[in-house]
Amino acid sequence: VLSINAGHWIQGDHGHDRKDVGATIETFIETFRNTGKSKRPALILKTSGATFSTVQYNDIYKRIRNITDKYRVEIPNIYVIEGSFSTDEMNALYNHKKVKAMVSFTHGEGYGRPLAEFCITQKPVIASNWSGQKDFLTHSVKLPGSMKEVHHSAANNMILKESKWFYVDYGYASKIMKDVFK
């Protein structure tokens, strides 16, 4: 397993959710879809909501299928882990010998606790070069990108449509994922 993306996959069209999970999945697939099956990494998508619900679970799988169904070739496996984990469970996941790195394309509006926790493993972190995580991701790959207006599908009472979010350079992110996988 090359990477973990820890976060919420909530409001916002593809590529416009707070954590940019859809674009992370698509970039991962584009990066490794032509890799031989025996050498192809997998993606672990760790999500959590307020509580577990079948509706949320089905929504996550629908979002993934909306991305994966357009590919007519074999693609890397995507494993979904849903729910709240204890500190020990997250530690075991982060430190699992098959987990090689964490990837986060978050648009950046906070500290990035999962990124801070993952740093303790001393494994690579590939993350947006924006927001609170810049303070502690000193030995990680900070992805370049640009500021763009928040997409109307993500705007709500907390995220104003006049706001701007950071969008990573997906081509550069793909190159870095390949380098980390080698």
Regions found by a protein language model. Give the residues of each.
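Short alpha-helical segment that forms part of, or immediately flanks, the ligand-binding pocket
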Residues: 91, 116-123, 131-135
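Short glycine/proline-rich turn/loop motifs
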Residues: 5-12, 99, 153-162
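Short catalytic/ligand-binding loop motif for oxyanion handling, primarily in non-cytosolic enzymes
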Residues: 10-15, 51-55, 111-112, 133-136, ...
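Short hydrophobic beta-strand element within catalytic cores of glycosyltransferases
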Residues: 124-127, 141-144
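Conserved catalytic-core segment of nucleotide-activated headgroup transferases in glycan assembly
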Residues: 1-89
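Nucleotide-sugar-dependent
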Residues: 15, 105-112, 134-135, 156-164
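Acidic donor-binding loop of glycosyltransferase active sites
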Residues: 92-110, 120-123
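C-terminal "capping" alpha-helix adjacent to the active site of nucleotide-linked donor transferases
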Residues: 147-182
